[in-house]
Amino acid sequence: MALVRSLRHLSMEKAGPHLAVECTYSIIRDLDGRLCLQIDTYGSTGRKVPGGKSQSMRFTPEAIAQLRSLLETHFR
């Protein structure tokens, strides 16, 4: 699992195609009792283990605040 503490901008020259997958989220408390956002994605049907958990990212409160600001700025 990845613990995301901050986000850094990276410009992409071009965006390639992506496959659609299932995604879930959970609101959990870390060991210090702070609320975190966890996002999990699950393997596409073409993978060796279809539907198995593929990626897991847990966002700290600081990363959540940064993500919120990015969304408000770019996706009004």
Model-derived regions: residue spans:
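Positively charged, low-complexity terminal tracts
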Residues: 1-76
